[in-house]
Amino acid sequence: MAKTVVRKNESLDDALRRFKRTVSKSGTLQEYRKREFYEKPSVKKKLKSEAARKRKNRRRFK
């Protein structure tokens, strides 16, 4: 879990900005969104193969 301590003489907006940055760097929200709903193993496999195909195409046309 991301933790941010508010520094002395730091505005709440600055602390919130630092907290959001740490959460995005840790990947907490992405992990939550990925696990929010159950995905059948067949769907996971299909999405994984599609992502691999996209990566392969991007590398080929670069």
From Swiss-Prot:
The gene is rpsU. GO terms for biological process: translation. Transmembrane segments: none annotated. Belongs to the bacterial ribosomal protein bS21 family. Keywords: Ribonucleoprotein, Ribosomal protein. It comes from Lactiplantibacillus plantarum (strain ATCC BAA-793 / NCIMB 8826 / WCFS1). It comes from the Bacteria. Residues 43-62 are annotated as: Disordered. InterPro entries: Ribosomal_bS21 (IPR001911), Ribosomal_bS21_CS (IPR018278), Ribosomal_bS21_sf (IPR038380). Residues 53-62 have a biased composition (Basic residues). One of its GO terms (cellular component) is ribonucleoprotein complex. Residues 43-52 have a biased composition (Basic and acidic residues). Pfam families: Ribosomal_S21 (PF01165). This is Small ribosomal subunit protein bS21.
